[in-house]
Amino acid sequence: MEQNEIYAALPGVLLPWYEKNARDLPWRHTKEPYRVWVSEIMLQQTRVEAVIGYYERFMEAFPTVQALAEADEARVLKLWEGLGYYSRARNLQKTAKLLTETQNGAFPDTAEALEKLPGIGAYTAGAVASICFEQPAAAVDGNVLRIIMRMTADDRPIDLPQVKKEIGEALCKVYPKGRCGAFTQALMELGACVCTPKSPKCEVCPTQSFCRAYKTGNVTKYPVKRPKAVKKTEERTVLLLECNGRFAVEKRSETGLLAGLWQFPNVPQKLDAQTAVQTAQSFHTDPKELVLETHKTHIFTHIRWEMTGYVIRCNAMSEAFTWASLAELERDFALPTAFRQFSDELKTL
Protein backbone atom coordinates (compact mmCIF):
# COMPACT_ATOMS: atom_id res chain seq x y z
CA MET A 1 0.00 0.00 0.00
CA GLU A 2 1.40 3.40 -1.01
CA GLN A 3 1.80 6.12 1.61
CA ASN A 4 -1.10 8.22 0.30
CA GLU A 5 -3.27 5.10 0.37
CA ILE A 6 -2.39 4.54 4.03
CA TYR A 7 -3.60 8.05 4.87
CA ALA A 8 -6.76 7.55 2.80
CA ALA A 9 -7.57 4.30 4.62
CA LEU A 10 -7.48 5.88 8.08
CA PRO A 11 -11.00 7.37 8.36
CA GLY A 12 -12.65 4.15 7.22
CA VAL A 13 -11.06 2.05 9.96
CA LEU A 14 -10.71 4.62 12.74
CA LEU A 15 -14.24 6.07 12.84
CA PRO A 16 -16.06 2.75 13.47
CA TRP A 17 -13.38 1.75 15.98
CA TYR A 18 -13.71 5.09 17.81
CA GLU A 19 -17.50 4.82 18.05
CA LYS A 20 -17.12 1.51 19.89
CA ASN A 21 -14.06 2.29 22.00
CA ALA A 22 -14.07 6.00 22.88
CA ARG A 23 -13.53 6.76 26.55
CA ASP A 24 -16.25 8.71 28.32
CA LEU A 25 -14.47 11.99 29.09
CA PRO A 26 -16.28 15.12 30.35
CA TRP A 27 -15.09 17.39 27.52
CA ARG A 28 -16.43 14.94 24.94
CA HIS A 29 -19.99 15.66 26.04
CA THR A 30 -19.92 19.01 24.24
CA LYS A 31 -18.75 20.78 21.11
CA GLU A 32 -18.75 24.14 22.85
CA PRO A 33 -15.45 25.79 21.81
CA TYR A 34 -14.73 27.22 25.25
CA ARG A 35 -14.88 23.84 26.99
CA VAL A 36 -12.99 21.98 24.27
CA TRP A 37 -10.31 24.68 24.25
CA VAL A 38 -9.81 24.57 28.03
CA SER A 39 -9.56 20.77 27.96
CA GLU A 40 -6.98 20.81 25.16
CA ILE A 41 -4.83 23.37 26.97
CA MET A 42 -4.99 21.32 30.17
CA LEU A 43 -4.11 18.11 28.35
CA GLN A 44 -0.83 19.54 27.08
CA GLN A 45 1.98 17.74 28.96
CA THR A 46 -0.57 16.22 31.37
CA ARG A 47 -2.22 12.79 31.62
CA VAL A 48 -5.96 12.51 30.97
CA GLU A 49 -6.56 10.92 34.39
CA ALA A 50 -4.96 13.90 36.12
CA VAL A 51 -6.84 16.47 34.04
CA ILE A 52 -10.42 15.29 34.66
CA GLY A 53 -10.67 16.68 38.20
CA TYR A 54 -8.97 19.94 37.27
CA TYR A 55 -11.25 20.39 34.27
CA GLU A 56 -14.42 19.83 36.28
CA ARG A 57 -13.36 22.24 39.04
CA PHE A 58 -12.29 24.85 36.48
CA MET A 59 -15.60 24.61 34.62
CA GLU A 60 -17.53 24.90 37.85
CA ALA A 61 -15.62 28.06 38.78
CA PHE A 62 -15.55 29.58 35.27
CA PRO A 63 -18.44 28.13 33.23
CA THR A 64 -18.14 30.69 30.40
CA VAL A 65 -15.52 32.69 28.54
CA GLN A 66 -16.84 35.82 30.24
CA ALA A 67 -16.52 34.27 33.70
CA LEU A 68 -12.87 33.41 33.04
CA ALA A 69 -12.19 36.87 31.60
CA GLU A 70 -13.57 38.56 34.72
CA ALA A 71 -11.90 36.25 37.24
CA ASP A 72 -9.12 37.28 39.58
CA GLU A 73 -5.81 35.93 38.26
CA ALA A 74 -4.88 34.55 41.66
CA ARG A 75 -8.05 32.43 41.64
CA VAL A 76 -7.26 31.12 38.15
CA LEU A 77 -3.72 30.19 39.16
CA LYS A 78 -4.94 28.55 42.37
CA LEU A 79 -7.29 26.29 40.40
CA TRP A 80 -4.39 25.47 38.06
CA GLU A 81 -2.08 24.57 40.95
CA GLY A 82 -0.43 21.20 40.37
CA LEU A 83 -0.91 21.16 36.59
CA GLY A 84 2.33 23.04 36.02
CA TYR A 85 3.29 25.18 33.02
CA TYR A 86 1.40 28.11 34.54
CA SER A 87 1.80 30.25 31.42
CA ARG A 88 -0.99 28.07 30.01
CA ALA A 89 -3.40 29.39 32.65
CA ARG A 90 -2.35 32.99 32.08
CA ASN A 91 -2.79 32.63 28.32
CA LEU A 92 -6.23 31.10 28.84
CA GLN A 93 -7.30 34.22 30.67
CA LYS A 94 -5.62 36.53 28.14
CA THR A 95 -7.55 34.86 25.33
CA ALA A 96 -10.80 34.93 27.33
CA LYS A 97 -10.40 38.67 27.88
CA LEU A 98 -9.55 39.26 24.22
CA LEU A 99 -12.56 37.29 22.97
CA THR A 100 -14.88 38.96 25.47
CA GLU A 101 -13.69 42.44 24.51
CA THR A 102 -13.61 41.97 20.73
CA GLN A 103 -15.92 39.07 19.82
CA ASN A 104 -18.53 39.06 22.59
CA GLY A 105 -16.97 35.80 23.80
CA ALA A 106 -17.28 33.99 20.46
CA PHE A 107 -14.45 31.87 19.06
CA PRO A 108 -13.23 32.10 15.45
CA ASP A 109 -14.09 28.98 13.47
CA THR A 110 -10.88 28.38 11.51
CA ALA A 111 -7.54 27.00 12.65
CA GLU A 112 -5.73 29.96 11.08
CA ALA A 113 -7.72 32.50 13.12
CA LEU A 114 -7.57 30.45 16.31
CA GLU A 115 -3.79 30.20 16.08
CA LYS A 116 -3.52 33.98 16.35
CA LEU A 117 -4.90 33.92 19.90
CA PRO A 118 -2.55 33.88 22.93
CA GLY A 119 -1.31 30.42 23.86
CA ILE A 120 -3.02 28.61 20.98
CA GLY A 121 -0.61 26.72 18.75
CA ALA A 122 -1.21 24.65 15.64
CA TYR A 123 -2.30 21.54 17.57
CA THR A 124 -4.90 23.26 19.76
CA ALA A 125 -6.16 25.33 16.83
CA GLY A 126 -6.64 22.17 14.76
CA ALA A 127 -8.39 20.37 17.61
CA VAL A 128 -10.88 23.18 18.28
CA ALA A 129 -11.51 23.88 14.58
CA SER A 130 -12.17 20.22 13.77
CA ILE A 131 -14.08 19.18 16.91
CA CYS A 132 -16.21 22.30 17.31
CA PHE A 133 -16.58 23.57 13.74
CA GLU A 134 -16.09 20.40 11.63
CA GLN A 135 -13.17 21.97 9.79
CA PRO A 136 -10.61 19.64 8.08
CA ALA A 137 -7.84 20.88 10.37
CA ALA A 138 -5.31 18.35 11.65
CA ALA A 139 -4.26 18.33 15.31
CA VAL A 140 -0.80 16.78 15.20
CA ASP A 141 0.79 16.00 18.56
CA GLY A 142 3.17 13.29 19.77
CA ASN A 143 0.42 10.67 19.71
CA VAL A 144 -0.51 11.38 16.09
CA LEU A 145 3.12 11.58 15.00
CA ARG A 146 3.80 8.18 16.57
CA ILE A 147 0.83 6.60 14.77
CA ILE A 148 1.81 7.95 11.36
CA MET A 149 5.53 7.21 11.70
CA ARG A 150 4.74 3.60 12.58
CA MET A 151 2.15 3.10 9.87
CA THR A 152 4.44 4.54 7.20
CA ALA A 153 7.70 3.19 8.74
CA ASP A 154 9.14 6.70 8.50
CA ASP A 155 12.50 6.84 10.27
CA ARG A 156 12.96 10.61 10.16
CA PRO A 157 13.19 12.25 13.61
CA ILE A 158 9.71 13.39 14.67
CA ASP A 159 11.06 16.54 16.27
CA LEU A 160 11.92 17.97 12.85
CA PRO A 161 9.37 20.75 12.15
CA GLN A 162 9.12 19.73 8.49
CA VAL A 163 7.97 16.22 9.46
CA LYS A 164 5.11 17.56 11.57
CA LYS A 165 4.12 19.99 8.82
CA GLU A 166 4.05 17.28 6.14
CA ILE A 167 1.98 14.92 8.27
CA GLY A 168 -0.52 17.66 9.09
CA GLU A 169 -0.92 18.53 5.42
CA ALA A 170 -1.38 14.87 4.43
CA LEU A 171 -4.00 14.30 7.13
CA CYS A 172 -5.99 17.40 6.15
CA LYS A 173 -6.52 15.89 2.70
CA VAL A 174 -8.33 12.83 4.09
CA TYR A 175 -10.54 14.43 6.75
CA PRO A 176 -14.08 13.09 6.20
CA LYS A 177 -16.68 15.80 5.61
CA GLY A 178 -19.05 16.10 8.54
CA ARG A 179 -16.91 13.79 10.70
CA CYS A 180 -13.83 15.96 11.18
CA GLY A 181 -14.17 16.18 14.96
CA ALA A 182 -14.66 12.44 15.33
CA PHE A 183 -11.62 11.76 13.13
CA THR A 184 -9.42 14.08 15.20
CA GLN A 185 -10.56 12.43 18.42
CA ALA A 186 -10.17 8.94 16.94
CA LEU A 187 -6.52 9.67 16.17
CA MET A 188 -6.04 11.01 19.70
CA GLU A 189 -7.70 7.94 21.19
CA LEU A 190 -5.66 5.48 19.14
CA GLY A 191 -2.41 7.10 20.21
CA ALA A 192 -3.43 7.30 23.86
CA CYS A 193 -4.89 3.81 24.27
CA VAL A 194 -3.54 1.48 21.56
CA CYS A 195 -0.53 2.84 19.65
CA THR A 196 1.26 3.73 22.87
CA PRO A 197 4.98 4.53 23.18
CA LYS A 198 5.76 1.31 25.03
CA SER A 199 3.89 -2.01 24.79
CA PRO A 200 1.54 -0.98 21.96
CA LYS A 201 -1.59 -3.14 21.66
CA CYS A 202 -1.06 -4.06 18.02
CA GLU A 203 -3.30 -7.12 18.27
CA VAL A 204 -6.39 -4.90 18.67
CA CYS A 205 -5.30 -1.99 16.47
CA PRO A 206 -7.72 -1.16 13.63
CA THR A 207 -4.80 -0.10 11.40
CA GLN A 208 -2.96 -3.40 11.80
CA SER A 209 -3.62 -4.58 8.23
CA PHE A 210 -1.72 -1.69 6.64
CA CYS A 211 0.77 -0.70 9.36
CA ARG A 212 4.24 -1.12 7.87
CA ALA A 213 6.00 -1.21 11.24
CA TYR A 214 3.70 -3.99 12.46
CA LYS A 215 4.24 -6.04 9.32
CA THR A 216 8.01 -5.89 9.74
CA GLY A 217 7.91 -6.47 13.50
CA ASN A 218 9.58 -3.14 14.24
CA VAL A 219 6.79 -1.18 15.91
CA THR A 220 8.78 0.08 18.89
CA LYS A 221 11.60 1.22 16.60
CA TYR A 222 9.33 4.13 15.69
CA PRO A 223 9.16 7.02 16.13
CA VAL A 224 12.78 8.10 15.92
CA LYS A 225 13.83 11.06 18.06
CA ARG A 226 16.99 13.10 18.13
CA PRO A 227 19.00 12.66 21.37
CA LYS A 228 17.75 14.87 24.20
CA ALA A 229 20.01 17.38 25.86
CA VAL A 230 21.03 16.36 29.38
CA LYS A 231 19.00 18.21 32.04
CA LYS A 232 20.96 20.70 34.09
CA THR A 233 20.87 20.07 37.86
CA GLU A 234 20.57 23.03 40.21
CA GLU A 235 21.02 22.88 43.99
CA ARG A 236 18.62 25.06 45.99
CA THR A 237 18.01 25.74 49.66
CA VAL A 238 14.43 26.39 50.75
CA LEU A 239 13.81 28.28 54.00
CA LEU A 240 10.59 27.17 55.69
CA LEU A 241 10.33 30.01 58.20
CA GLU A 242 7.60 29.58 60.85
CA CYS A 243 6.36 32.13 63.37
CA ASN A 244 3.26 31.60 65.52
CA GLY A 245 1.84 28.99 63.16
CA ARG A 246 2.38 31.09 60.04
CA PHE A 247 4.94 30.54 57.27
CA ALA A 248 6.86 33.01 55.14
CA VAL A 249 6.07 33.11 51.43
CA GLU A 250 6.90 35.55 48.65
CA LYS A 251 5.99 36.12 45.03
CA ARG A 252 8.42 35.14 42.31
CA SER A 253 9.45 37.56 39.59
CA GLU A 254 6.89 38.22 36.84
CA THR A 255 9.33 36.80 34.28
CA GLY A 256 11.17 33.51 33.96
CA LEU A 257 10.53 30.10 35.48
CA LEU A 258 7.31 29.91 37.59
CA ALA A 259 6.73 33.61 36.92
CA GLY A 260 4.47 35.43 39.35
CA LEU A 261 3.72 32.40 41.54
CA TRP A 262 4.20 32.09 45.29
CA GLN A 263 7.19 30.35 46.83
CA PHE A 264 8.93 29.74 50.11
CA PRO A 265 12.08 31.89 50.39
CA ASN A 266 14.97 30.09 48.72
CA VAL A 267 18.47 30.57 47.37
CA PRO A 268 20.09 28.93 44.30
CA GLN A 269 22.76 26.99 46.21
CA LYS A 270 23.03 24.32 48.90
CA LEU A 271 23.53 25.79 52.37
CA ASP A 272 24.49 23.90 55.49
CA ALA A 273 22.20 24.21 58.52
CA GLN A 274 24.22 26.93 60.23
CA THR A 275 24.36 29.09 57.10
CA ALA A 276 20.63 28.57 56.54
CA VAL A 277 19.88 29.91 60.03
CA GLN A 278 22.21 32.86 59.41
CA THR A 279 20.38 33.57 56.15
CA ALA A 280 17.07 33.52 58.03
CA GLN A 281 18.58 36.01 60.48
CA SER A 282 19.54 38.31 57.60
CA PHE A 283 15.82 38.54 56.76
CA HIS A 284 15.14 39.96 60.27
CA THR A 285 13.12 36.95 61.41
CA ASP A 286 15.07 36.38 64.66
CA PRO A 287 15.39 32.58 64.26
CA LYS A 288 15.24 30.60 67.52
CA GLU A 289 15.23 26.92 66.53
CA LEU A 290 16.14 24.68 63.59
CA VAL A 291 13.32 22.11 63.65
CA LEU A 292 13.88 19.92 60.61
CA GLU A 293 16.08 19.34 57.57
CA THR A 294 14.40 17.72 54.57
CA HIS A 295 15.25 16.99 50.93
CA LYS A 296 13.09 17.14 47.80
CA THR A 297 13.60 16.84 44.05
CA HIS A 298 11.59 18.48 41.30
CA ILE A 299 12.12 17.98 37.57
CA PHE A 300 11.13 20.64 35.05
CA THR A 301 11.27 20.22 31.28
CA HIS A 302 14.83 21.51 31.06
CA ILE A 303 16.19 21.56 34.60
CA ARG A 304 16.28 19.44 37.76
CA TRP A 305 16.09 21.05 41.20
CA GLU A 306 17.74 19.26 44.12
CA MET A 307 16.33 21.07 47.15
CA THR A 308 17.35 21.08 50.80
CA GLY A 309 14.66 22.49 53.06
CA TYR A 310 15.15 23.81 56.58
CA VAL A 311 12.19 24.35 58.91
CA ILE A 312 13.23 27.22 61.17
CA ARG A 313 11.10 28.60 64.02
CA CYS A 314 11.35 32.37 64.29
CA ASN A 315 10.41 35.06 66.81
CA ALA A 316 9.60 37.77 64.28
CA MET A 317 7.51 38.05 61.12
CA SER A 318 9.70 40.01 58.74
CA GLU A 319 7.89 42.52 56.54
CA ALA A 320 9.95 41.18 53.64
CA PHE A 321 7.48 38.28 53.38
CA THR A 322 3.80 37.46 53.45
CA TRP A 323 2.96 35.18 56.37
CA ALA A 324 0.22 32.58 56.00
CA SER A 325 -1.14 29.61 57.91
CA LEU A 326 -1.08 26.17 56.31
CA ALA A 327 -4.84 26.41 55.80
CA GLU A 328 -4.42 29.74 53.99
CA LEU A 329 -1.58 28.35 51.88
CA GLU A 330 -3.84 25.47 50.87
CA ARG A 331 -6.83 27.68 50.09
CA ASP A 332 -5.50 30.98 48.75
CA PHE A 333 -1.96 30.69 47.42
CA ALA A 334 -0.86 29.18 44.10
CA LEU A 335 2.26 27.30 45.17
CA PRO A 336 4.04 25.39 42.38
CA THR A 337 4.45 21.66 42.97
CA ALA A 338 8.18 22.17 43.58
CA PHE A 339 7.32 24.06 46.77
CA ARG A 340 3.95 22.47 47.54
CA GLN A 341 5.71 19.21 48.43
CA PHE A 342 7.33 21.07 51.34
CA SER A 343 4.02 22.48 52.57
CA ASP A 344 2.58 18.96 52.61
CA GLU A 345 5.39 17.89 54.94
CA LEU A 346 4.81 20.88 57.23
CA LYS A 347 1.38 19.48 58.11
CA THR A 348 3.09 16.71 60.08
CA LEU A 349 4.97 19.08 62.39
Model-derived regions: residue spans:
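Catalytic cores of DNA base-excision repair glycosylases
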Residues: 2-203, 207-216, 220, 284
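Intrinsically disordered, low-complexity, charged terminal extensions of DNA damage-control enzymes
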Residues: 1-24, 29, 192-349
